[in-house]
């Protein structure tokens, strides 16, 4: 059985950008799947062009990490389960290392949100930098937990699918799309 967690149209309808929404998703999964989960795909996120810097941080990083950690015991019940998160190939160098370090080493959402609240949310380069930072931090988190999780029968990996036509990319401005298409990625846009 596939269970879809979404803001509006899921089997579990919650806001993964909020701590309450994440906990509700975890609680509902524990109720719906008491015998465990075979796997999970963490794919919720917003682009750097969304205009809400806090949302980028809360959804793209904390949403994934909190839900994955929250269902870890369910994943362990099904020895051989798998978690796939979505990172990004551009996340290796264009983000803010200070934000990446705060996300990975401190993990204090309120502190990071306080820091980004003083940034210019109307500046696309600021939003894109935070987007890249969350994806890089997510890849680092996956790398950090992967050995421990694997020892307990749970594989976890971050994939970088490249450009994909999704609801997120459909709302990007023409300038943002041109910048994205200028990246030297040897592929066409993928389909959702």
Segments and roles (model prediction):
Residues 41, 84-86, 156-159, 169:
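Hydrophobic structural elements of the Rossmann-like NAD(P)H-binding subdomain
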Residues 160-171, 175, 180-182:
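Short, flexible catalytic-loop segment of classical short-chain dehydrogenase/reductase
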Residues 46-50, 54, 76-151, 163-166:
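Catalytic loop of short-chain dehydrogenase/reductase
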Residues 28-42, 48-50, 75, 79-81, ...:
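A glycine-rich helix->loop->beta "capping" turn
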Residues 5-21, 29:
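Rossmann-fold cofactor-recognition segment
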Residues 184-192:
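A conserved structural motif in NAD(P)-dependent oxidoreductases
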Residues 11, 56-57:
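A hydrophobic alpha-helix adjacent to the NAD(P)-binding/active-site core of NAD(P)-dependent oxidoreductases
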């Amino acid at each position: 059985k596939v269970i879809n967690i979404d803001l509006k149209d899921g089997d579990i309808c919650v806001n993964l950008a909020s701590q309450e929404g994440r906990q509700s998703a975890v609680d509902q999964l524990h109720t719906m799947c008491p015998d465990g989960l075979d796997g999970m795909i963490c794919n919720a996120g917003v682009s750097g062009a969304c205009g809400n810097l806090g949302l980028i941080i809360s959804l793209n990083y904390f949403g994934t990490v909190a839900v994955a950690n929250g269902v870890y015991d369910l994943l362990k019940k099904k020895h051989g389960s798998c978690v796939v998160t979505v990172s990004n190939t551009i996340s290796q160098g264009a983000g803010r290392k200070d934000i990446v370090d705060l996300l990975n080493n401190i993990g204090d959402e309120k502190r990071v949100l306080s820091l980004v609240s003083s940034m210019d949310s109307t500046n696309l380069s600021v939003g894109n930098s935070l987007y890249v930072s969350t994806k890089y931090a997510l890849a680092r988190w996956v790398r950090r937990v992967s050995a421990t999780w694997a020892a307990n029968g749970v594989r976890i990996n971050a994939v970088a699918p490249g450009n994909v036509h999704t609801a997120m990319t459909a709302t990007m401005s023409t300038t943002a799309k041109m910048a994205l298409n200028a990246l030297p990625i040897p592929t066409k846009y993928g389909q959702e």
